[in-house]
Amino acid sequence: HAALISRLKIMAELDISEKRMPQDGRISLRIGGRAVDVRVSTLPSAHGERAVLRILDKGDANKFTLESLGMSGDSLSRFKRLLRQPHGIVLVTGPTGSGKTTTLYAGLSTVDAATTNVLTVEDPVEYELIGQTQVNAKIELTFAKALRAILRQDPDVIMIGEIRDFETAQIAVQASLTGHLVLATLHTNDAPSAVTRLTDMGIEPFLLSSSLLGVLGQRLVRKLCVHCKRQDGQGKWHPVGCTECGMSGYKGRTGVYELMVADDEIRGLIHAQAAEAKLFEIAQLNGMKTMREDGDRLVGEGVTSLEEVLRVTRE
């Protein structure tokens, strides 16, 4: 075990003599002609160090399209409409590992790179795209510092890997108010709670109501294996398990989404500092389908199972 951890730390260019402190690194590999990035995180424990690896396919960002993400036709057309706006802020929200960055890159693929200056600030850079800046805590290049520098590079579209603090949120909102389209991710449970998170960080409601275009909440669900899924007497599909899917009944993943578009009514509620529940209620009345409802659509289409949707969504 210790030898394996040491080998991983050498490959990730970590300090192999330091066993008392957590460390983060990365390994760049080429497997089958494809560039693969492995993020390595080590943590001391009672019985030696433990390591977790996260594998990223560092391919071309343009391989992602919004059409391939599994959105409903209505959400897809509304989301594309937001991305065509000349300025404002579009947020993608969800827990860690819910596909937020992939959605942002798919959104960027709709932008005409020949006529639009697209710049990104990420930690770390996940997919290849011209005009990326990687945050580096070791040299104190924070999201906020990188964003300030990027604003002097005449960007049309700015993508922020994650809004983590007030300073980053403030610059993002100001940038969206001064003629830039800003795409960013945030960690919240659903689309309307992104508004509460930003105001809790210290963003003035009148600034947020003026700049916000919309919020996309999302989760990832496993797709039923097409080789072995079974339909019951009521027409519902269930996982079975075969050699194709490693006996799990599932193969591949897709997203469930909810899109809150900031129309005049939603902007008014944000400005008036309305409760999260009220935002949710009005967003639904104005056409927002919840993640649970979107999941029900996938269940009806036989893409995933009801158990999967219930696992990742809440009432």
Predicted regions, residues:
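Short, flexible helix-loop junctions that flank or precede catalytic/ligand sites
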Residues: 1-315
